[in-house]
């Protein structure tokens, strides 16, 4: 099986991982606060991951990168790093959609916690209801979130888009079945959605160590990217901010 380096930089939690023979054998995560520090730390983290594989004489076959949506700067840094590694080492490039990545720990774990607006935290059942839908969310600033809707097989029910967090956005699904909301953007939507079929899973963030099943599936099916022309899925155009201090 393949050895894959995984890179995730869509949020302020920068992470890398290495999988070999369908098992994660190395992972590292670090919260960053400044744009410059994110680029610097990612380079160091990748170097450390490669030192680990070199010490075990494990050659890489591919690099997988979380491709968005998410932080414009973070995605640009992560994708640039992945493309550089693939070009320099003649590796295959795999793009993993960030919101699908967020679903992986929810589908695999039996020890999550869920909440509603009317109950305290309680253990998640050993598996999700058969008709459950998953709605991973990333903060898109202001009153918006990046969100998609998926079934338990990760089939897209509604494509990714930037949503305004109001009560009507997900009503067509909530009126019919339970919908599980999670990810860094879910917290600010809890009160706005306010539906009895809404379930909230806390503590979910996109991490490189969860990329393995999605990346490996894409690699085995030949879903790799053109290293020269691949770009992140930003979804929204970048908006430059004015500096706080004017010269």
What spans do the regions from the language model cover?
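DPxDG-like acidic metal-binding loop motif
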Residues: 64-98
């Amino acid at each position: 099986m393949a050895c894959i380096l995984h890179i995730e930089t869509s949020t302020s939690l920068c992470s890398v991982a290495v999988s070999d023979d369908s098992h994660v054998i190395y992972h590292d995560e670090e919260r960053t606060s400044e744009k410059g520090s994110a680029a610097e730390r990612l380079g160091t983290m990748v170097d450390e991951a490669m030192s680990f594989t070199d010490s075990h004489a494990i050659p890489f076959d591919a690099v997988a990168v979380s491709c968005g949506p998410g932080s414009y700067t973070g995605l640009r840094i992560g994708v640039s790093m992945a493309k550089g590694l693939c070009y320099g080492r003649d590796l295959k490039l795999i793009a993993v959609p960030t919101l699908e990545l967020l679903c992986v720990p929810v589908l695999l774990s039996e020890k999550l916690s869920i909440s509603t607006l009317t109950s305290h935290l309680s253990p998640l059942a050993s598996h999700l209801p058969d008709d459950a839908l998953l709605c991973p969310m990333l903060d898109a600033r202001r009153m918006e979130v990046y969100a998609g809707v998926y079934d338990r097989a990760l089939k897209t029910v509604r494509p990714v888009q930037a949503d305004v967090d109001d009560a009507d956005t997900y009503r067509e699904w909530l009126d019919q079945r339970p919908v599980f909301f999670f990810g860094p953007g879910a917290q600010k939507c809890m009160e706005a959605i306010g539906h009895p079929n809404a379930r909230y899973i806390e503590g979910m963030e996109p991490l490189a160590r969860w990329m393995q099943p999605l990346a490996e599936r894409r690699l085995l099916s030949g879903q790799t990217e053109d290293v020269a022309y691949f770009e992140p899925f930003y979804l929204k155009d970048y908006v430059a901010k004015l500096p706080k201090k004017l010269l």
